[in-house]
Structures are given as structure tokens and as C-alpha cells.
Design a protein with these regions (language model features):
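Conserved, mostly hydrophobic/aromatic
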Residues: 7, 35, 64, 94, ...
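Active-site beta-loop-alpha junctions enriched in small/polar residues
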Residues: 9-11, 15, 48-49, 79-83, ...
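Mid-to-C-terminal alpha-helical segments outside catalytic/metal-binding sites
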Residues: 1-10, 17-42, 202-204, 214-250
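Active-site gating/metal-coordination segments in enzymes
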Residues: 55-133, 187
């Protein structure tokens, strides 16, 4: 069974990297060994330094794009801090690359520090114009339906499925343009994946690791109480369907 990790991160040697220790590694070579062990073919990356600080977002996007172009396993989410106008121009110039999956936003306090509702129209109208995916860390989830309905050419992945809000907004979106992913620790709940598949269908759920153990994340789907077709959709088919040009060789 092929696997595409649509949502992960890594450090890049920046002073704004996230600390790692013996218990949780965030460096690229370690993550690639995890990929090999678990049979993951490729990942959609953004640098931690671009998400947890607003100081090197432009530089991080540029550096990661170079890495993606030189490594078949690496695909990119372009990080957008909507307070920085230069990033809109950068993203516009890179979005058509076969190594780019879309836009990543991280509004939370301690990260880019903005009110998602204050900047939502600016972000999502831009994505609507580009007809691209936006991957967001969960923030004011129930408010996102209005923007998905307002900007139907934008597709929104609200990451880290963990509860009823994720499921309900997927059901409520008028144009079917809200999705979620399995990344993060919350998927360890023993019925969250199964319940989400029952309610919204496996076609709305992407696989991601978020740098949590690939063995745990892949095992959570492989041994879930869902059909083989549902497992294939989450682990591979959905990414392949929605990112045809990017993953055409996988």
C-alpha cells in the first residue's frame, strides 16, 4: 500500500527551529529514516522556523523550495503570514511549481499571532484566485464554513482531526471544499478515525504525521476498523486525486 504524508515539518538549521531532544527528533535525516521504515514515499513539508516565528518566513519558503526541487521525497506547503505582503508575491510566483501543494497558515499565539477572522478574507480570497489548497492549524473551526462557502475555488484542510467540530464543518460546507487530516497526537483516540470515516467518508481525510511517530501514524490507519478502500483513500488515493500533477510519479 502506497503512502503519502501530506502534512509534516522539519527543522532547517535556523535559529528559529523548534528544539528537539532524545525523545522527539525533528531533523530531516531522522524523518527520512522513519519514512523508509514505514514505506512513506513522499511528504508535504513546511519548516518549523517558518511557522513558529514570523522572522524568516520568506527565507524559509525559498530554502525549502530549493530542497524540494532537489529531492523526490519532498513537496512543499508555502507558508503565509498575511501580515507580510512580500509573501503574497512570493507565493504567487511559486504556486504553479509541481513541488508545491498549496498554502500553509498558522495563526496561533506564539506562532504568527493574528486573529484568523481578521485576515480570513485576505487569505482565502487569495487562495480562491489561485484555485489552491490551504492547510491550516485548527483555529476557530466553526467559523471556517462561511469562508469555504464564500470562496468555493479554495479547498481548505483543517488539520489534526480531533473532534466533532472538524466533522461538522466538513458536512456543512456547501461546496464540499473542507477536508481534514490524521496528523498529530489526537488521532490516538481509539474511535476518532473510524467515526470520522463513518460521518464524512474517507474521501475527506488526508494522511499526515506532523512529525509524530510515523510508525504510530501509519499503524493507526492500517489497523483502523475501516475498509481496505478507506485505508487506501486516506493513505494514498486522496492525495493522488487532488494533487495529480505533484504526485504523478508516485
Amino acid at each position: 500500500m502506497k503512502i503519502i504524508d501530506l502534512h509534516t515539518h522539519c527543522n532547517c538549521g535556523s535559529k528559529f527551529d523548534i528544539a528537539e531532544n532524545e525523545f522527539h527528533q525533528r531533523n530531516f535525516p531522522f524523518l527520512m529514516e522513519e519514512y523508509r521504515n514505514c514505506g512513506i514515499s513522499a511528504g508535504g513539508f513546511s519548516y518549523y522556523s517558518s511557522l513558529f516565528s514570523d522572522k524568516e518566513v520568506f527565507e524559509g519558503n525559498a530554502l525549502l523550495h530549493e530542497q524540494a526541487l532537489s529531492d523526490d521525497r519532498v513537496y512543499q506547503w508555502l507558508v503565509l503570514d498575511p501580515k507580510q505582503e512580500i509573501l503574497f508575491a512570493q507565493i504567487r510566483g511559486l504556486i504553479k511549481s509541481d513541488k508545491v501543494l498549496g498554502i500553509k497558515i498558522h495563526s496561533l499565539l506564539g506562532c504568527h499571532n493574528y486573529d484568523i477572522n481578521e485576515y480570513a478574507d485576505k487569505i482565502f480570497s487569495f487562495a480562491d484566485e489561485l484555485k489552491c489548497f490551504v492547510l491550516m492549524h485548527p483555529d476557530k473551526i466553526t467559523d471556517m464554513v462561511q469562508y469555504a462557502d464564500k470562496y468555493p475555488n479554495m479547498k481548505l484542510i483543517i488539520a489534526h482531526v480531533y473532534g466533532m467540530e472538524h466533522i461538522e464543518v466538513i458536512e456543512q460546507a456547501k461546496y464540499g471544499n473542507i477536508f481534514t487530516d490524521t496528523s498529530g497526537g489526537a488521532s490516538n483516540a481509539n474511535n476518532i478515525i473510524e467515526y470520522a470515516v463513518e460521518r464524512v467518508g474517507s474521501e475527506k481525510i488526508f494522511f499526515g504525521t506532523d512529525t509524530y511517530s510515523c510508525a504510530f501514524q501509519t499503524g493507526r490507519i492500517k489497523y483502523a476498523r475501516i475498509s481496505e478502500k478507506d485505508k487506501e483513500n486516506i493513505l494514498y488515493n486522496n492525495a493522488k486525486k487532488h494533487f495529480k500533477e505533484q504526485f504523478k510519479a508516485i
